[in-house]
Design a protein with these regions (language model features):
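Terminal-appendage/accessory-domain detector
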Residues: 1-185
Length: 185
């Protein structure tokens, strides 16, 4: 099976765009200086995630421009960036309006090129050849564990490490009791 672990809680075609936006975030600095954002992307990005004005967290999960805006402004993209209040926040709503998606038929599915034009006329560019979490660039064990911690800790506080150990132990044992105990408490 060709399975991967997704780093972001949204449509997978958005992942290279988010990678690029997060990489651009410290280089751009103040997002208020952005005049325009040009995105060269695979056709499926527009087809599947072309919602330019999401109003809810669910809609934003299928919005390429939301993923880019959140990555640029917040420097990270996780569940908090898909909360309804964050989706409708003025800074992200404004920035989404600056983003133009250009379909490039030659662009691989897990690649992107983003050019951010700033108010002084300068341009900051980031290309991603393979999205993090893709078959060509899978998440590391440490990244997967961090994702698990971010997802588990809010619902099973203080049990993240025990849960990870119990899952790791499954390879050596057919006994799932320890795992069941961790999640049942």
């Amino acid at each position: 099976l060709d399975n991967v672990v997704k780093p972001y809680p949204c449509g997978i075609v958005i992942h290279p765009l988010i990678d690029a936006a997060i990489a651009l975030s410290p280089r751009v600095g103040d997002s208020g200086r952005i005049v325009r954002i040009a995105v060269d992307c695979h056709p499926l990005v527009v087809e599947l995630t072309g919602n330019s004005a999401p109003r809810t967290g669910l809609q934003a999960r299928f919005s390429a421009v939301h993923g880019i805006a959140a990555g640029l402004v917040d420097g990270q993209v996780g569940l908090p960036q898909y909360a309804d209040a964050r989706v409708t926040a003025a800074d992200l709503t404004w920035l989404r309006g600056m983003i133009v998606l250009h379909v490039d038929e030659r662009m691989p599915r897990d690649a992107v090129r983003i050019a951010v034009e700033l108010d002084d006329g300068s341009q900051v560019v980031q290309a991603i050849d393979h999205a993090r979490g893709s078959m060509a660039r899978p998440m590391t064990t440490a990244e997967v564990r961090e994702k698990v911690a971010n997802l588990v800790e809010p619902v099973l506080p203080g049990r993240t490490e025990k849960l990870i150990r119990a899952v790791d132990a499954l390879e050596q044992s057919n006994d799932v009791r320890e795992l069941a105990e961790v999640v049942a408490r």
